[in-house]
Amino acid sequence: MWCTTRRLGPTQAAFSITPSFRRGAGMCGPRSRSVLPVTSSWLLAAVYCCGARTTTISEATPWPCGNDTLGGSKPGAARFAAAAMECEDTSGLLQQQHQQRSGIATGHSGGGVSGHELQHSPGRTEQEDEEKTKAEGRRGGCRGDRRGGRVAGLQSAASVGRRDQGPILDAKTIKKYVTPLVIPPVMRTARCRTLFCGPRRVAKYEIAMRRFKQQILPGAHWNNPIWGILQEPLPENHTFGSTEVFGYGPAADPEPDSTALNGSLGLAPAANSQFNYPAYTVENTRFKPTSVDWINHLVENPWKCKWRWPRGPDCNFIKHIIPVDQSLHWANPGRLMCNPALNKTIDCRPSNVTDPELGRQYSGPVPMVVHVHGGHTDPESDGYPEAWWLPAASDISESFARQGTLVNQFGRLTNFRLGVANFRYRNDQPSATLWFHDHTLGMTRNNVYAGPAGFWIIRESGGRETGLVRGSLPGPAPRPGEGLLETNLPGKKGRDRLREIPILIQDRSFYENGSLFYPDNRAFFEELHPDQLQIPLIGNPENVSDIPRIWNPEAFFDVMVVNGVSWPVHKVEPDLYRFRLLNGCGSRFLNLALCVVDGSGAPCPLDSDGRPDPPEHELSFYQIGAEQSLLPKVVEVRTGFKTALPGNGFIPRHKRPASSPREALLMGPSERADVLVDFRGLKKGTVVRLINTGPDEPFGGFDPSVGIADENTTRQVMEFHVVHDTKVGNDATPPEHLKLRLPDANDPANLVWRQPAVVTERRDLALLEEDSEEICSTTEADGAIVWDPEAEPNPEEPGTCRLKGSNASTVVSKPFGPKAVLLGINGSSVDFRRTLWEDPIVTNPKKDTTEIWEFWNWSEDSHPIHIHLVKFRVISRIRFNTTTAMLAEKSEPAVPTEAGWKDTVIAYPGQVTKVAATFDIEGLYVWHCHVLEHEDNEMMVPYCVGPKSSAPGCDVVP
């Protein structure tokens, strides 16, 4: 079916017809505007193309979007649906339009996720419907047909992957629950050398990033019964090759050799080497600093190339294993020409958009810089995106920049060696679950997708927990000095004793040869074959474009990878367990639940709200902590409910409803959840599956019209198998008896994280999307997107196109998009000013002050917003009218699972999300969306704490 809507002006509304490709999507697509204007005062006017005949339906009620689309309660929706059934052929009107103006077909549908219905307001009045409709007109139409870049959407199309890798692997052919959950051991510290020892209280590491192979899919050493999962090896047709990854490990470690485990030389995980994906865990003690030499060792043979003295062909650089787009604002070590006015040759956006080089993948040495996410860290060690460095390779051209603009802020660090940077971490914050990952400007998504990431855990001395008033938590966790086998082999001295386990969840896709798949063209996001995306892209020498050729606005993959293994299984006792969960996906929001299944591999039955059916088959999560601390109360989380426990030994019978009946343990990218799971009372042989009921597309809230993840792939995450009838040796306190509190601001030990009572500044910050300023396109009947060379985006009326050289706005084509996702500064009403990475800094908190930041989300997606340096409290959310910027009468407080200290928060579409943070270290930091594809294309900007002199690059605008 075809439909779209946009606002032409205060007394005009125009609706038109455009294809809808997404299963379960609504009829309206904000990027679909084949326009035939109908003059009215916000009339509903749906124009149906039925051959050469048109049918118009008008009604004084607003256009039914979101939940009211197709079959909604309003008469207009029903009449629209009835008329839609009559439409069988649209070629008549399309041919007529094509004859009138060459190059124009139908409007392109590729907008946003359906379901921008505000998460905290499941019901709406008619007045609210009208306001919502007007808002959609302002933003360019109803949500409903954003394609979203899904591998699943390409399975029926021709191969869109790299030709040298072969076809993409169908995730449904991968056997599930035949590989063990790999529990990351603790990374060992470096041996102390006299020159580099530093203070004795400082934990010292030398951690390198190298290329190696990892067995992520079933096969190789996972076919070995030693892990206690398989009784006999899998047949050959259920095994897969290894995957080339980038990963971290101690620089002194040898090449992984898993030959004794049925693997091979060069294949991780291995007992002889701590190089692994994900990285082994870096354990830290509160108030004990940690010093890390981060080494870029991405060379041909890092095991033979001595990183301190690189010489010879073994030390030649390697190119990235993931396609890198050179047209973004990125590190640009090859110094492609940028805007001369900026006086920069690196860390900039190349300006010659017709240069064919910008359409090619970057093939030079790979830059890196590491960020400890959630760390209370000095700016020179925070992993600022312009503080990257290349490997000390022997064949890098002299024309390349070896380091980023700010690799040695303040001159405080000892970064005098190429290929290495020394970062120092205070660890002066409450015990928490942090993580570390790459943060290079414009290519974070590439580096993180390739593998380098790991847990960074802070504990109190003696293993205590900040904020635990009464009770004890499940343990033990993996201990320093234990290797892969001690941590992961079955037995009471191995994994069976562990009750605290970090779990990193990511989505990935693969070629049939086992290599990682990541899209190398924009057609992926449109779910088209590259030949069907017929528009100029950056790097086209004949036509100017502002659409990147390789970058995709979002990307969703079809294999769930947990701790570096596809769909693993973990055997548990009937006992209490503590899981430190991390959403490490690039774009995917997770909505996690626990479901008791029959063990046959069949999907977990769900009711219409996405709850396990029957309800007693769902196990609760007991969330005890968020990103930066324990919560003030244990929160029982079940699908549709989030109930704070009083801590007196009772679990309330009346549960507190969650923001949506479909909401379970919702986690945006980079959010963490510290949870307890109670397997006590479950019989031997019980199978508990961790499921994901989030969408396979960008998340905009729990709209019923948006489907949940594929039941055969991304809805399943991992399984827990109960293997004994009685628990063994765990004295953990049941969750209903635990008493927690937030870290006490009056405790002298917490002075560095004290929250001043006086708020000194309130900032309104905008979350935006931006369509092309150069390219107008239409969509043909087969879905192909075609350039309209005679049209240009109309700056007077955003979201529309006009004939070049004319003010006419009745053309069928529309601006192609999105070209970028942006941040901005809100004005007094609906005005906002976009801010780019290259712009002067406008956010300048004073040292030791507390500010309230309000994130106004004008876009169609939810965004996980991360602020470096600080912990913050989520204060409230409130809906706003995106036409008038008028706020709703009532705000809603943070949900119970957000009551602790956080560093990442979900900002929902059409809502203002309010947080409060204290800025206590001077210097240059960033804040950004943690959808990595957004972050890499302008949805990240710097901010500066303190005066302009506090750090290089703090060019603050008052």
Regions found by a protein language model. Give the residues of each.
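Cleavable N-terminal signal peptides of Sec/SRP-targeted secreted and luminal proteins
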Residues: 33-54
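N-terminal, immediately post-signal peptide pro-regions of secreted/luminal proteins
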Residues: 55-157
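N-terminal, post-signal-peptide metal-ligating segments of extracellular/periplasmic oxidoreductases
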Residues: 142, 147-371, 376-391, 395-396, ...
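Short, hydrophobic/aromatic beta-strand segments
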Residues: 218, 293, 301-311, 450, ...
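Asparagine-centered strand-capping/turn motif at beta-strand->loop junctions
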Residues: 294-298, 581-585, 692, 855-859
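Extracellular/periplasmic metallocenter environments
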Residues: 298-300, 328-466, 643, 651-725, ...
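Histidine- and aromatic-rich segments of cupredoxin/plastocyanin-like copper-binding domains
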Residues: 377-394, 505-512, 517-745
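Active/binding-pocket-proximal capping segment
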Residues: 596-600, 613-630, 858-897, 932-935, ...
